Amino acid sequence: MKLRVILGKENVEKYQGINDIDIDIIYDDDDLIVQSDLSQSFYEIGPNKKIYFFGRVVGIKTNNIELTRVSGKSDFNEIFTAIDIEGIDNVVNNIEGRFIFVYIDNNKVSIGTDALGQIDLYYEKYNDGAILSSELDLLPFKDNSKIEYDQTGVAHALYVYGYRPAKKHTLYSKVKRVGLHELAE
C-alpha cells in the first residue's frame, strides 16, 4: 500500500498536479493532498466532515468488550456517531483492523493508524507543513544530497530490535514515525 498525505499550502503548490509516484490523487484542496494506490473506504460524515480508511476495518469495540463487525456504509454509522460525540482521538482506539485513516473536519486534518500501529506511518516536517507517508521513499528527505542519520534509531536497529528502529524513530534524523495512539494533526 502506498499512501502520501501532503500538508501545507507551500507543499501543496509544489506537488499539485505532479504524479511523481504513479498513485491516484484521492483528495485535493489548497493545503491538503491525499494520494494512494489502494482503494479506500470513504465516508462523508456531514458538511465539511470526511473520513478515509486505507486498509481494512474489521469492526468497532462497543463497551470496550464486544466487537461489532463493519462492512458497508450503514455499518459505519456507529463509528460516525461516536466520532461526532467523542472526537476522532477517542474513537480510533476502539476501531479494529489494519488501516491508516485521514479525518477531515472543516479545516482540521487528523491522520493516524489503527490502535496497534500495524501499518507504519512516517512523517517529515517540510516547508510550511508536513508530508506523511506509508513508505519512506515517498518522502522528500531522499532528494537531499546529504542524508543525516538518527543515532538513536541506528542504535535500536542494530542492538535492541535487531532489524528496525524504535517505534517513533527511523534511521533518518528528519523522518519520524507516528507512534501508537498518536495523531498527526
Q: What is the role of each PLM region?
A:
Residues 1-185:
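Cysteine-centered catalytic environments shared across enzyme families
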